[in-house]
Amino acid sequence: MIIDTTELQAINSFFKLESLKEVYGIIWILIPIFTLVLGITIGVLVIVWLEREISAGIQQRIGPEYAGPLGILQALADGTKLLFKENLLPSRGDARLFSIGPSIAVISILLSYSVIPFGYRLVLADLTIGVFLWIAISSIAPIGLLMSGYGSNNKYSFLGGLRAAAQSISYEIPLTLCVLSISLLSNSSSTVDIVEAQSKYGFWGWNLWRQPIGFIIFLISSLAECERLPFDLPEAEEELVAGYQTEYSGIKFGLFYVASYLNLLVSSLFVTVLYLGGWNLSIPYIFVSEIFDINKAGKVFGPVIGIFITLAKTYLFLFIPIATRWTLPRLRMDQLLNLGWKFLLPISLGNLLLTTSSQLLSL
């Protein structure tokens, strides 16, 4: 069979067109991911600056002021310093576990951002099991901490890793029961559907008023999951030097530093999504999603308004964990476990049973 040059050119141009389509498809997949990573990076830098400024205000002292205007570049300066420090390995530790541990902690938290809606249709993965995927992914992080503690071949590091694992297990269950109660109220486990279910009545439609007990339990459990005071037992300086971070230096120590603030930001974002109405305004019967369909300008400003509302609620909520750091003393290990197993677990289970009963009676 003879094929002339015209047909060959047509076939070649077709394959070139198909390859270009594949390249464009890959680019359109990567753009949202890179945008999200850039936004998360900026968000973490803002949290570090806010914590230092709020902490300085609480302690009546001057915060960072030399690295950039108002000290906003202080976190960037700290990260650059850690980046150029020597990366040491323990002589008798397990080098593979020691190196993998920080990466597991950071990656597991980063994956949680994929199901967070920052606005109407502004979510990387709108899944029907969104909130439970977050819980499943976040439960991987303590494994990385335990690997870091064991791989360091240091008694303080190992005890810190064990404390982190025990603390995570103790508070993961009440947290899951609170999320399950929200899913029952919203008739969905999708983060987008949960926000939409709170939108009709504005401020009074928030799950904060429908689930006040669940909100308090979720707040306490999320503080414990983030290892913030008064739940920072895995890193207690007076007892364990620096816990599972004791043997780390350089960029690996910086990864733990970043993971702590990433976890704090993702917890605050989920509080906004689950209890504070997400991207919706506080005015009843006015929805940000309707702004998309008004005109072309609305299609541009609608997502911006949604992102602004979500981040405003998130950063306002962040004042609570920052303030508790300088307000409450650290718990003992037995007090921490008793609080999780003897108080929060029964109360969250009772809250779930009440929510289930009310939903059944409303049918």
UniProtKB/Swiss-Prot annotation:
Highest taxon above the source species: Eukaryota
| Compartments it resides in | Plastid, Chloroplast thylakoid membrane
InterPro entries xref list: NADH_UbQ_OxRdtase_su1/FPO, NADH_UbQ_OxRdtase_su1_CS
The top EC class, named as a word, is translocase
Q: Which GO terms describe its cellular component?
A: chloroplast thylakoid membrane
Q: Does the record bear Chaperone in its keywords?
A: no
Protein name, entry field: NAD(P)H-quinone oxidoreductase subunit 1, chloroplastic
The upper taxonomy is:
Eukaryota, Viridiplantae, Streptophyta, Embryophyta, Tracheophyta
